[in-house]
Amino acid sequence: MGQKVNPIGLRLGINRNWESRWFPTKANLVENIGEDYKIRAFLKRKLYYAGISQILVERTAKKLRVTVVAARPGIIIGKKGSDVDNLRKELQDLISKDVNINIKEERKAGASAQLAAESVATQLEKRIAFRRAMKKVIQGAQKAGAKGIKVSVSGRLGGAEMARTEWYLEGRVPLHTLRAKIDYGFAEARTTYGNIGVKVWIFKGEVLHKGMQPEKTEESAPAKKSRRTRRGK
């Protein structure tokens, strides 16, 4: 189960919170879901180069607040906040409602799975070797303090005739452990040979309740490193 399902959705209510935080009625449920989709699609397209790791949408009875967590917030804010004001106006025109925007900095960009996946996808589009791109992201996550990372790329890698999947694993990524705090990201690289899917899982440690003790592991054991290739049919 843990190998197939989205690890963020599996852990909602355990050690992850929802990214859309509001309580709907039957009358506005469909409208709110549609607005959330439009907001996220617009911001990801408009602010792609700002390195967005998370978009939170919060609603009250009269207010709608959007929080954007980005690795390069200066690109969004602009000089004296002028770009944020323009962005707010565009969002208000998009959904015909008043919107408050908060910009937060992603302090550990290397430990963000979404940013890591987008980084690999960008490098693949620039025709950088996929193994080199994967190793670079793994090194960045380790420097940021990640306890484990798995990177998977799928498609016509290197322009090969047959599609295949390759992945690297460093450290531990316990997908079946619900108390494990695992971040997940997905991106697509649009190359001349077709689309290449990129998936990244990052293990940041275990979230323990009071009275619980972490599992004992051998500190002297070297980090696990493996690579597996699966050819497409």
From Swiss-Prot:
<keyword id="KW-0699">rRNA-binding</keyword>
<dbReference type="GO" id="GO:0019843">
    <property type="term" value="F:rRNA binding"/>
</dbReference>
<dbReference type="Pfam" id="PF00189">
    <property type="entry name" value="Ribosomal_S3_C"/>
</dbReference>
<keyword id="KW-0687">Ribonucleoprotein</keyword>
<dbReference type="InterPro" id="IPR004044">
    <property type="entry name" value="KH_dom_type_2"/>
</dbReference>
<comment type="similarity">
    <text>Belongs to the universal ribosomal protein uS3 family.</text>
</comment>
<dbReference type="GO" id="GO:0022627">
    <property type="term" value="C:cytosolic small ribosomal subunit"/>
</dbReference>
<dbReference type="InterPro" id="IPR018280">
    <property type="entry name" value="Ribosomal_uS3_CS"/>
</dbReference>
<feature type="compositionally biased region" description="Basic and acidic residues">
    <location>
        <begin position="212"/>
        <end position="222"/>
    </location>
</feature>
<feature type="domain" description="KH type-2">
    <location>
        <begin position="39"/>
        <end position="107"/>
    </location>
</feature>
<dbReference type="GO" id="GO:0003735">
    <property type="term" value="F:structural constituent of ribosome"/>
</dbReference>
<feature type="region of interest" description="Disordered">
    <location>
        <begin position="212"/>
        <end position="233"/>
    </location>
</feature>
<protein>
    <recommendedName>
        <fullName>Small ribosomal subunit protein uS3</fullName>
    </recommendedName>
</protein>
<dbReference type="InterPro" id="IPR009019">
    <property type="entry name" value="KH_sf_prok-type"/>
</dbReference>
<dbReference type="InterPro" id="IPR015946">
    <property type="entry name" value="KH_dom-like_a/b"/>
</dbReference>
<keyword id="KW-0694">RNA-binding</keyword>
<dbReference type="Pfam" id="PF07650">
    <property type="entry name" value="KH_2"/>
</dbReference>
<dbReference type="InterPro" id="IPR004087">
    <property type="entry name" value="KH_dom"/>
</dbReference>
<comment type="function">
    <text>Binds the lower part of the 30S subunit head. Binds mRNA in the 70S ribosome, positioning it for translation.</text>
</comment>
<dbReference type="InterPro" id="IPR001351">
    <property type="entry name" value="Ribosomal_uS3_C"/>
</dbReference>
<dbReference type="InterPro" id="IPR005704">
    <property type="entry name" value="Ribosomal_uS3_bac-typ"/>
</dbReference>
<comment type="subunit">
    <text>Part of the 30S ribosomal subunit. Forms a tight complex with proteins S10 and S14.</text>
</comment>
<feature type="compositionally biased region" description="Basic residues">
    <location>
        <begin position="224"/>
        <end position="233"/>
    </location>
</feature>
<dbReference type="GO" id="GO:0003729">
    <property type="term" value="F:mRNA binding"/>
</dbReference>
<keyword id="KW-0689">Ribosomal protein</keyword>
<dbReference type="GO" id="GO:0006412">
    <property type="term" value="P:translation"/>
</dbReference>
<dbReference type="InterPro" id="IPR036419">
    <property type="entry name" value="Ribosomal_S3_C_sf"/>
</dbReference>
